[in-house]
């Protein structure tokens, strides 16, 4: 009997001691296989088969040798690289200003930086049209220019940089805060200038975080569907072209091949970010407290960084303020009289897509949040058969573009025994399994900071794994739980690229309705939908915050009442 087989039997024996845990793991493995791996494999198989069912790579080779497809591929790569470089530079300066200087208004700057992340899609695209389109407030209203073409790559770069630089900021602010400042303080005491310290100490220590942030922004740029679809014009990108070929030409095979072309760089970037960059760290950890670190106070450093943060916050406010104004005018640039007709339309004829989106998000959010924490708990605290497979399957959807997921679901669930297309179930499944990776990552990070002896004490007193997780672990990781819930709700409300292939007449959602309004140039109706979505999302975040903060408090009060 080999050691590996003995280990297998030992793990199986441990699992069988807790039948409910064993059944839970089996159920999770089944659903991850069904809703993540199966659609992914189905799409790969479909793209690599001929009409008579024979496996071949010639279809994929022909896609890469097609001049039009190749141009579209390099357009997406070029947009992703430029956005990643500019967005990471801005994100780094923004993070450095907030974490390393004593400038004012930091809470305001932090709040503004998170706004593009939790906002509906199309906001920045719509604001660019309102400001710089043919009837734009700036182009036509201020300068009288009527032939300015706002569509194309340049506008896309601006929009994507403003949309995704907050991702780089959040990543890099954590990196900068974790760097021990004692080395920098020592260099300063020895007479080194701030510039010398930055270029020889701070920047080199930040390199792993910079590369990680750049890859994350690159992935987001590649996977972005809404902005290229609205403002791309003749600048073709893979995700949008895939959608147009499938819905316009009814050619699922060609659309799938384009999605495979999009998948490859996205998956490579994800693997690099997760397994290569994360393994490289140059951060110094001395064990000394760093909370009272000295902040940079030199005016020639603080003032330019303050101006930079203020500029980008002003641009964000301008964009969002423009959309808000656009929701209250009849026809932007033509008839700017104030009206509430767009909101009357939403809450009468156009209410169903909004109700559907909220309903589906309310159902999917707690499922995704709880599943994320359970999978994180199992991955960190338990040792069982299929653990690595569960980890890979649960995190894979983060690397998959929405168009890839949508096409995979069409192919996987369009026939018996898993006929789900056109139902609410398929949309809920997309929302749940597309959004759990962030909750899992947050839960794993939180669990890594908790001493396992706390849970071991609960187990030794007779509690099973479920009781320990519910009463001990979950209240301790409620911060990660809250983040997972918020992310899931926001992404469920704002999803476009995956659900646009899966909606039906009964189950249309607000984002696809907004997209259809863009196609017929009903921009003020779209703006009104966006304003309502922002209000709904903010209200949901507030409610989730209250609900998660009460986690564990009611139980403690009940225990005190029994004494």
Task: Please give the residue ranges for each predicted region.
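Transmembrane alpha-helical segments of polytopic membrane transport and secretion proteins
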Residues: 1-26, 274-310, 545-563
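Juxtamembrane inter-helical linkers in multi-pass membrane proteins
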Residues: 52, 185, 193, 280-296, ...
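Helix-loop-helix hairpin linking two adjacent transmembrane segments in secondary transporters
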Residues: 240-265
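Glycine-rich helix-loop "coupling/hinge" segments at transmembrane-helix boundaries
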Residues: 49, 225-249, 334-335, 496-523, ...
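Juxtamembrane helix-boundary/capping and inter-helix hinge elements in multi-pass membrane proteins
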Residues: 66, 101-104, 177-182, 192-195, ...
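A short amphipathic helical element positioned immediately N-terminal to and/or at the very start
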Residues: 8-13, 56-64, 338-347
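The alpha-helix within a helix-turn-helix
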Residues: 187-188, 458
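Membrane-water interface segments at the C-terminal ends of transmembrane alpha-helices
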Residues: 17-51, 65-177, 205-225, 257-274, ...
């Amino acid at each position: 009997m080999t050691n590996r087989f003995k280990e297998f039997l030992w793990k199986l024996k441990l699992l069988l001691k807790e039948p409910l845990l064993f059944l839970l793991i089996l159920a999770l493995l089944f659903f991850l296989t069904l809703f993540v791996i199966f659609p992914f494999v189905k799409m790969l198989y479909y793209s690599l088969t001929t009409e008579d069912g024979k496996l071949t790579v010639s279809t994929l080779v022909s896609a890469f040798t097609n001049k039009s497809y190749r141009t579209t591929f390099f357009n997406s790569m070029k947009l992703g690289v430029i956005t990643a470089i500019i967005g990471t530079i801005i994100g780094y300066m923004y993070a450095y200003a907030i974490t390393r200087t004593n400038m004012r208004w930091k809470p305001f700057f932090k709040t503004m930086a998170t706004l593009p992340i939790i906002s509906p899609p199309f906001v920045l695209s719509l604001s660019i049209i309102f400001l710089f389109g043919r009837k734009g407030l700036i182009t036509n209203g201020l300068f009288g220019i009527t032939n300015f073409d706002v569509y194309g790559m340049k506008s896309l770069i601006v929009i994507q940089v403003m949309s995704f630089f907050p991702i780089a900021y959040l990543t890099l602010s954590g990196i900068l805060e974790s760097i021990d400042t004692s080395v920098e303080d020592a260099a300063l005491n020895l007479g080194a200038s701030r510039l010398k310290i930055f270029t020889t100490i701070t920047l080199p220590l930040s390199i792993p975080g910079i590369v990680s942030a750049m890859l994350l922004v690159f992935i987001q740029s590649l996977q972005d569907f809404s902005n290229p679809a609205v403002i791309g014009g003749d600048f073709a990108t893979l995700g949008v072209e895939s959608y147009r070929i499938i819905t316009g030409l009814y050619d699922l095979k060609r659309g799938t091949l384009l999605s495979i072309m999009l998948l490859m760089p996205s998956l490579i970037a994800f693997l690099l970010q997760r397994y290569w960059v994360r393994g490289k760290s140059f951060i110094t950890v001395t064990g000394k407290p760093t909370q009272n670190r000295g902040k940079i106070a030199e005016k020639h450093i603080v003032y330019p960084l303050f101006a930079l943060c203020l500029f980008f916050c002003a641009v964000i406010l301008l964009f969002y303020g423009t959309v808000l104004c656009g929701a209250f005018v009849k026809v932007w640039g033509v008839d700017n009289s104030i009206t509430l007709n767009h909101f009357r339309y939403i809450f009468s004829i156009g209410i169903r897509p909004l109700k559907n989106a909220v309903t589906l998000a309310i159902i999917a959010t707690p499922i995704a949040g709880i599943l994320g924490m359970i999978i994180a708990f199992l991955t960190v605290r338990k040792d069982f058969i299929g653990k690595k497979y569960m980890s890979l399957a649960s995190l894979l959807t983060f690397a998959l573009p929405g168009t890839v997921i949508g096409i995979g679901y069409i192919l996987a669930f369009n026939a018996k025994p898993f006929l789900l297309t056109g139902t609410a179930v398929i949309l809920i499944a997309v929302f749940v399994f597309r959004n759990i990776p962030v909750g899992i990552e947050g839960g794993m990070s939180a669990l890594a900071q908790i001493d396992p002896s706390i849970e071991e004490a609960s187990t030794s007193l007779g509690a099973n794994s479920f009781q320990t997780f519910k009463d001990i672990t979950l209240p301790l990781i409620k911060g990660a739980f809250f983040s997972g819930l918020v992310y899931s709700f926001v992404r469920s409300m704002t999803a476009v690229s995956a659900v646009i292939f899966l909606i039906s007449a009964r189950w249309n959602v607000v984002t696809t309705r907004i997209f259809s309004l863009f196609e017929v140039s009903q921009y003020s109706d779209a703006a009104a939908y966006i304003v309502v979505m922002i209000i709904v999302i903010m209200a949901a975040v507030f409610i989730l915050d209250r609900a998660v903060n009460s986690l564990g408090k009611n139980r403690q009060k009940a225990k005190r009442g029994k004494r």
